[in-house]
Amino acid sequence: MFRWGIIFLVIALIAAALGFGGLAGTAAWAAKIVFVVGIILFLISLFTGRRGR
């Protein structure tokens, strides 16, 4: 999940450096969404893992 976030971040940085504003904004938005989903899934797995023990 974090791998996809990093990939979208790199795409956004490259697009921003080359001047493609719309593509950079879209890739940055996708990276934020993937990052937030990854954090939420991490927290869920952290709490459910502790309850099982």
From Swiss-Prot:
InterPro entries cross-referenced by the UniProt entry: DUF1328
Ribosomal protein recorded as keyword: no
Superkingdom: Bacteria
TM regions (residue ranges): 4-24, 27-47
Membrane topology per record: Multi-pass membrane protein
GO cellular component, one term: plasma membrane
Primary site of residence: membrane
Keywords: Cell membrane, Membrane, Transmembrane, Transmembrane helix
Record has Hydrolase as a keyword: no
Disulfide bond sites: none
Subcellular location: Cell membrane
Family under the similarity heading: Belongs to the UPF0391 family.
HAMAP family in UniProt: UPF0391
Name this polypeptide is given: UPF0391 membrane protein SG0393
